[in-house]
Design a protein with these regions (language model features):
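Sequence-structural signature of the catalytic-core scaffold of metal-dependent phosphohydrolases
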Residues: 1-30, 34-85, 95-173
């Protein structure tokens, strides 16, 4: 649909080639694949497409922000990179069988609120904790929360500056 998608080498070798990301090839995106048997509808291809659209959005926001804010250009660009990373990794927390398997995250021994606590512990900022406690169960789906956790834990070399974890998690959830 989008033609060739350019992905920086640092993302290709560290993220796209990782087992965490490659498993998305085996998670079906939609249940319509029997209707279009030659189409590829998996979370891997979907995530690459979301990344591509995210790069377009980030560049446009970056250009607009440069005209209306006093933030340094490098800081604006860095936030754009974190947003793009969140776009790429937004589905890495999917359970097997995609949304059908999401109920696994809500079983008796791992309550929904415990998933929120895992994310709060991972991000570890007062503002994020306050927002999660206020909105818990009202906004993010379990796979989105797990995607933020998996992204932060699996790719710490890409989420390093102060505030990166929080911004990354907010982009996904």
């Amino acid at each position: 649909v989008y033609g060739y998608i350019k992905i920086p080498m640092k993302y290709m070798s560290d993220i796209v080639d990782s087992a965490v990301f490659q498993r998305l090839r085996r998670i079906i995106q939609t249940s319509y694949s029997p209707l279009y048997s030659s189409a590829v509808h998996n979370r891997f291809v979907h995530s690459l497409g979301v990344y591509y659209l995210g790069t377009i959005a980030a560049k446009n926001v970056e250009r607009e922000l440069e005209n209306i804010t006093e933030m340094k250009k490098e800081d604006i660009h860095h936030l754009g990179e974190i947003f793009e990373l969140a776009c790429l990794l937004h589905d890495v927390g999917h359970a097997p069988f995609s949304h059908t398997g999401e109920k696994l995250y809500l079983s008796d021994d791992l309550k929904y609120n415990q998933i929120h606590k895992l994310l709060v512990d991972e991000v570890d900022t007062k503002s994020f904790t306050k927002d999660i406690e206020h909105y818990a169960g009202k906004c993010a789906a379990p796979h989105e929360i797990m995607s933020a956790i998996v992204g932060i834990r699996a790719f710490p070399n890409h989420i390093v500056k102060a505030g990166d974890k929080e911004f990354f998690a907010r982009c996904i959830t």
